[in-house]
Amino acid sequence: MSDPRKRNSAAMTDGPSRAPARSYLKSIGFNDKDLARPIVGVAHEWIETMPCNFNHRRLAERVKEGVRAAGGTPMEVNTISVSDGVSMGTDGMRASLISREIVADSIEIASVGHSFDALVVIVGCDKTIPAGAMVLARLNIPGLVLYSGSIAPGRFRERDVTIQDVFEGVGAHAAGKMSAADLMELENVACPGAGACGGQFTANTMATALEFLGISPPGANTVPATDSGKNDTAFEAGRLVMSLLDQGACPRDFITRESIENAITAVLATGGSTNGVLHLMAIASEAGVPLELEDFDRISARVPILADLKPWGTYVATDVFKAGGLSVIARELLKGGHLHGDVRYVDGQTLSDVAAAAAETQGQCVIASIDNPIKETGGLLILRGNLAPDGCVIKVSGQKREVFSGPARVFDGEEACFEAVIAQDIEPGSFVVIRNEGPAGGPGTVSYTHLTLPTSALV
């Protein structure tokens, strides 16, 4: 009699008629015992074009070990990724947001095509993170997302540096404030190994969101990419997905209106990326949960900023880990009544459970208390007007002023803007408008980070 947990894979592996399929699988090392167990997909985006996903194959091996230890048979799947940091300022950036759909679609196709009973998606670079949640919500088979971790800061002349410093170094060099030799020295040390961008850019914003969404194990996403504990989180993810399979617990059990509001709250409280709006709306859509732009504005009006994180602040994701992790932020937000405490994580704990167990590092300066926030309201605003009648998103995490007035410089594309910046042809106090970078103009809905390179040069 087939294992009742083989809800999908029995059709692929069981019975005399499936002998050809079993023969194929036995040719690459699977045996009858393996094929009698539930089949768990382990998907990742290892690629040799970026540090963000460079540890995925190693983590996938550990996830697979965890699956086997809990009585399942893992099957590894690899798909593509596009690095914003590498492609920025080139035509390759047009592929960035499109890659989110391709990652989700390709994992879905592999999962359906090979009758996976459950799925673990290892994610790293910006667009892979929402893609992992999107495909789980779409398939709605037992599964979870594991973030492969943030990069550690580099060291440059006795201070910590990140890729943000390199971007700003490009502007400093263009302005004659930094020599080519110094820029090269900075370039060589800013990124010391595997991991996604260290600031609260898109990757760490979405890794934060997915923990509060409940679709990632609590505490797992904040463990840095090169920390020895990352292997342990991967092994436990493999064991945990088998527990979800035993229970019949599926992603849409966790991705609810309340958990999405928790994720939005976490993005706002950490000064997260505008891309958080774009991606959370896509995840909600896949899960069948209604979500509007106004929901972000409503929550932002009452949620304070508690984490002092780059690009506007002082610290990076590895510092959040050292300070006690996202559970400390959850504890403070829960104190202020900003979270739904009864929302469950994939490991069965509620958010209240996780917050109650928070272990804050004494003397840490990264995460503020709810009684003394860094800023009284959240880091994102939704605006409407003649330039954006359907709404637009702006990030105000590091801004104190509420009004800006200045002459507009309008460019038809990022390339023209960047040329003007490098030529120092933009007056201080100008309002820079870059047109034709949307779905039709880009084309392909060029990511907001496409603008990072020229705006970082405005120093």
What label would you give each PLM region?
Residues 1-26, 33-34, 373-376:
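N-terminal amphipathic/basic leader segments beginning at the initiator methionine
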Residues 96-262, 267, 272:
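Active-site cavity-forming subdomains of large catalytic enzyme subunits
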Residues 449-455:
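Conserved small/polar residues in nucleotide/adenosyl-binding loops
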